[in-house]
Each structure stands twice: as structure tokens, then as C-alpha cells.
């Protein structure tokens, strides 16, 4: 009995849960960016994409933001796209944070948690590396650092 309760209580990882799997098509993301523009992940087909679930109240999220800005510029010739999905924090705080860091990529609001649920997010930050064909290649739970970015990006950067 105790083992059954312990198994139910253990933390989930994205690979433990049905509905999303490395090697499968990434779930659709259709929504509105914080600046009011419509967004559809399908419009980025043909580009390597990083989908990052974040919020300005999350310290590791704040710490990885400069890395995403740096890598987006470094891989511009590859067509790299970054998409933020705002989790839990309010849009006004997120807009101020984005302006402070000079982030140029779109952030989509997820007020109902539908996107978070489709991606089986277990915490923030959490990043999904999607190849040019819309296939999920890697999932990173926790802060993406310089030391792991190269491997994660290599999984989606080949034509």
C-alpha cells in the first residue's frame, strides 16, 4: 500500500506522461502574443524552434533569458526561432521583463493552462526543441545553460 502511494506521489517528467513524446509531432500552439498579435506554431515550420515555458517570477527563467537572446542572434542564419509561453505570472510583469531584457521573440499567453497541459509541463523553466519538420527532438526541464545548449540545439539544427 505504501509503495502504491509513493508511486503516485513521485514527480512526473514529460516522458512519463501520455500525449507528448520525443520523436513525435509537437502539439499545436495557437494563441495571442503579449503584444496582441495572433500566433500559430505551424507558421514556423521550416525553422528550428525552441518553445520555452517561463515567467518573470521564476529565477532560473530570468537567468536563462540572456542565453536565449544570445543564441537567437548567433543562429539567426539557421532561422532559429524562440517562442515563450507565459506561465502563472501576469502579462504586465512579463511585458516589463521582456522590455528590460530586450527580448525580440514572441511570448504567448496561456491563461487557461491549455498549452501547458498539452505539453505536459512539470515546472518552469521547461524548454522544447522542435526541428524544422515540427518534430519534438529534446525536452529540457529546468534552466538551459551554455554547457547543454549546444547538444540541445544540435538535435534541431540540421536541415
Residue ranges and their predicted role:
Residues 51, 83-85, 128:
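Conserved hydrophobic packing residues within short motifs/helices of P-loop NTPase cores
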Residues 39-62, 68:
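Short active-site neighborhood of thiol/selenol oxidoreductases, capturing the structured segment around
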Residues 1-28, 159:
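N-terminal targeting signals for export/organelle localization
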Residues 62-101, 111-118:
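Structural microenvironment flanking redox-active thiols in thiol-disulfide oxidoreductases
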Residues 96-103, 109-158:
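Thiol/disulfide oxidoreductase modules built on the thioredoxin-like
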Residues 20, 28-49, 72:
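A short beta-strand-turn-helix
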Amino acid at each position: 500500500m505504501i509503495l502504491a502511494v509513493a508511486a503516485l506521489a513521485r514527480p512526473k517528467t514529460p516522458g512519463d506522461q501520455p500525449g507528448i513524446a520525443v520523436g513525435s509531432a509537437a502539439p499545436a500552439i495557437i494563441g495571442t502574443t503579449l503584444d496582441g498579435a495572433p500566433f500559430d506554431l505551424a507558421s514556423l515550420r521550416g525553422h528550428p524552434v525552441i518553445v520555452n515555458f517561463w515567467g518573470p517570477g521564476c529565477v532560473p527563467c530570468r537567468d536563462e533569458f540572456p542565453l536565449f537572446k544570445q543564441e537567437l542572434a548567433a543562429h539567426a542564419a539557421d532561422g532559429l526561432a524562440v517562442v515563450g509561453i507565459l506561465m502563472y505570472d501576469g502579462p504586465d510583469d512579463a511585458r516589463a521583463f521582456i522590455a528590460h531584457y530586450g527580448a525580440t521573440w514572441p511570448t504567448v499567453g496561456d491563461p487557461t493552462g491549455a498549452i501547458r497541459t498539452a505539453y505536459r509541463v512539470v515546472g518552469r523553466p521547461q524548454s522544447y526543441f522542435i526541428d524544422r519538420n515540427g518534430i519534438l527532438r529534446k525536452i529540457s526541464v529546468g534552466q538551459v545553460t551554455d554547457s547543454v545548449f549546444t547538444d540541445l540545439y544540435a538535435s534541431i539544427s540540421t536541415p
